[in-house]
A protein has these predicted regions:
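N-terminal cap/lid segment of alpha/beta-hydrolase-fold proteins
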Residues: 294-370
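Short, surface-exposed "cap/lid" segments of acyl-processing enzymes
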Residues: 362-413
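N-terminal targeting leaders of membrane proteins
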Residues: 22-122, 214-284, 664
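Catalytic histidine-centered segment of alpha/beta-hydrolase-like enzymes
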Residues: 640-651
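Alpha/beta-hydrolase active-site loop
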Residues: 424-449
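Conserved alpha/beta-hydrolase "acid-adjacent" motif
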Residues: 592, 616-622
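Short beta-strand/loop motif that positions the catalytic acidic residue
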Residues: 603, 609-611
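Alpha/beta-hydrolase-fold enzymes
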Residues: 471-567
Length: 664
């Protein structure tokens, strides 16, 4: 069981970065009726490798879909009704250091699996590394409770298994097969996992050293395994549009990485060359242009690399109270900021799902005037109200004394089937009207429940959320907003929706030349670099090329569109950004943007902008337009590309100043 849950956890922890590089999923089943059809290989039709196609190729066909979905439903129910209650109790009794120590010890005991797996694939050096790790961690790590092999000596685990060994022998993986709590999704890999258990000492220890309490050691240790897995499960699987496909594709991707020993090899590459081998040199940021009307910020110590690489730094923007040292997230004693955010719902219209939002009240110690401040947070395209960036912004506002409401972005699938009333977004003026109606409903809900009183409302949104802020300003100007607003702040908004879509499409375009083998090679090479950087934030930028960063950024921004179309229409879609614009957005709305409401933005003193001079979603005319339209109501950062400066103190201070939460 330990190996089961540990592998499951690893697969789910990888999911965030796998999404970013292109392993995503669509809603394959709506209303209980499957709509999935066999897919044509991308390489066969010379199309671009969309996020959906990458996920399909890695996970493969699902010939036993009915059986597999039933097995997944069994696992999902067990996680909800058995595992979750047990986990809450366990994590509230044992502190996180104890749970992690036990996890390390169990991992150390599984040395025979990794040793045999690497030896059978002819990787003698890997087998020797595993032997050294076992010896060091057993002696110096007090039976494996700690990991000095990695932390002191730079000896890394291969995470090898017999599933990967069978793959290197050329054994086909066979049909997709999902079994409850078996962290493999193909016949070959499930067989390898079962044989792994024969090499696991815990399989036999129960026979020789009974616990005396009616259950074996493996079962007694199961809650500890669960504690390490359930948070990633809830964050990456339960929150997806189709949890079954999310699970199947994430586990298939993790299995592929383990087969190639990808993370192990990259960690050794980093150890051999701490500065990495492909990181581009630091570039000189743009200098303040002559005659600039807006404010100007140079970010101390930012070290810009390349625009797409710098954009990935938005991953550094997360709540500061996000990793309680003593207690796991499931514990009643956990102090993470996310536990302070109440997830609420509000009815929008009959026949549609209630729309969700997050709410965190102002601190009790806030001044009376500050406690009246209520700030709505609208994340970027596809963003969720409980995403790391939305919560980080809410924490920033909360710590400044305000209450905060986090919303799903209107291009999010949950929002589309609730607050957007089942209408695909893209007609920005109409989308903004439905957004304002949702915001009015939220204000009424909070007032009705005594959570806010006579609130002074502000709004902050970034990327596509920033563009929606601009259209809320037009509604205010036309007297259609429905509530009084104090300040509206748009961060890194694209000026021209059509130009932004074209830029994203151009970033994905080079993938048309990739064969299937080249795509898999890129996936195995780039994903470990993102995974490792996501954990250690090495030098603040991931160790990937600008070309790969462009594809990563574009795949992430575009991944939400197939989900939207599938959820709303009930038919599986792999729509590209350009096809979405031409196929689902009315002709009259395709060229809307900030320039079409220039007079409103120029004359509305409530609206301000924060932007970067090197944002690839702007061209030279866009930058001139913003500077001339907003004047001293715009702040320019010298670097950061598209939202890649959010983690810096300079940006955080400017947000609070523009929202009038601190003095400028």
């Amino acid at each position: 069981m330990k190996n089961t849950v540990k592998s499951l956890m690893a697969g789910l922890m990888a999911t965030g970065c796998l999404i970013a590089y292109g392993v995503t999923w669509t809603h394959l089943e709506t209303g209980g009726a499957s709509v999935a059809e066999p897919h044509e290989s991308v390489s066969a039709k010379n199309a671009e490798w969309s996020a959906l196609q990458v996920g399909r190729e890695i996970a493969g066909e699902d010939d036993w879909r009915g059986f597999n979905r039933f097995m997944f439903a069994v696992q999902d129910a067990a996680m909800d009704y058995i595992a979750t209650p047990i986990n809450h109790v366990y994590c509230s009794v044992l502190p996180k250091p104890v749970i992690r120590g036990v996890d390390n010890a169990i991992d150390n005991s599984e040395y025979p699996i990794r040793f045999v797996a690497t030896l059978l694939r002819g990787e003698g050096g890997c087998a020797w590394d595993e032997t050294k790790r076992f010896a060091v961690n057993t002696v110096l790590g007090i039976g494996g409770l700690f990991d000095p092999a990695k932390n002191w000596f730079g000896i890394f685990s291969t995470e090898a298994s017999l599933s990967g060994t069978f793959a290197t022998w050329g054994i086909p993986r066979g049909p997709s097969l999902v079994l409850p709590f078996v962290p493999r999704v193909h016949v070959r890999d499930c067989a390898g996992y079962i044989l792994d258990q024969g090499l696991d000492p815990k399989t036999y220890i129960d026979f020789f050293f009974p616990t005396g309490i009616g259950i074996g050691w493996s079962a007694a240790l199961w809650p500890n395994d669960l504690a390490m897995a359930i948070d990633p499960w809830n964050a990456n699987i339960k929150s997806s549009v189709d949890p079954y496909e999310a699970y199947r594709r994430a586990i298939a991707a993790k299995t592929l990485l383990d087969e190639k020993l990808a993370v192990y090899h990259y960690m050794n590459e980093l150890a051999a060359n701490e500065k990495g081998t492909r990181r581009p040199p630091v570039r000189r940021p743009p200098q303040r242009p002559a005659g600039l009307k807006g404010r100007w910020w140079d970010i101390a110590g930012y070290k810009p690399r390349a625009p797409a690489i710098d954009t990935l730094r938005i991953r550094l923007f997360a709540p500061t109270r996000d990793n309680d040292f003593w207690w796991m997230r499931s514990s009643v004693f956990n102090g993470d900021f996310a536990k302070d955010v109440a997830m609420r719902t509000v009815a929008i219209a009959p026949g549609f799902q209630d729309a969700r939002y997050g709410f965190v009240p102002a601190p009790a110690h806030s001044a009376p005037q500050q406690r009246k401040r209520l700030v709505f947070v609208i994340p970027g395209i596809g963003g969720e109200c409980d995403s790391a960036s939305a919560l980080a912004m809410a924490e920033l506002l909360h710590d400044a004394g305000a209450s905060a409401v986090t919303l799903d972005n209107p291009f999010n699938w949950r929002y589309a089937i609730s607050a957007n009333r089942g209408i695909l977004p893209g007609n920005l003026p109409e989308d903004a009207r439905r957004l304002s109606a949702f915001m009015r409903a939220v204000i009424d809900d909070l007032s009705r429940n005594g959570l806010v009183d006579d609130a002074e409302v502000s709004v902050v949104g970034w990327s596509m959320g920033g563009l929606f802020v601009s259209y809320l300003a037009k509604l205010e100007n036309d007297g259609e907003l429905g509530f009084k607003v104090d300040t509206l702040l748009a961060v890194n908004p694209p000026v021209d929706f059509n130009y932004a879509i074209s830029t994203i499409e151009s970033f994905i375009e080079p993938s048309k030349s990739w064969s299937r083998e080249q795509m898999l090679e890129k996936f195995v090479d780039v994903t470990p670099r993102l995974l490792v950087w996501d954990k250690i934030h090495f030098d603040s930028t991931p160790d990937i090329s600008e070309e790969d960063a462009r594809y990563t950024v574009a795949a992430f921004l575009a991944a939400t569109l197939p989900e939207l179309v599938t959820c709303v229409t009930g038919k599986e879609s792999s729509v590209s950004p350009r096809d979405y614009l031409t196929g689902f957005v009315p002709d009259s709305a395709r060229h809307v943007g900030m320039k079409t409401i220039e007079d409103v933005l120029r004359g509305n003193a409530h609206v301000s902008v924060i932007h970067t001079r090197d944002d690839f979603l702007l061209d030279a005319d866009d930058r001139d337009f913003l500077d001339n339209t907003f004047g001293d109501r715009i702040t320019w950062f010298s670097a950061g590309a598209h939202c890649g400066m959010f983690h810096t103190p300079e940006f955080k201070r400017e947000v609070l100043a523009r929202l009038k939460l601190i003095e400028e």
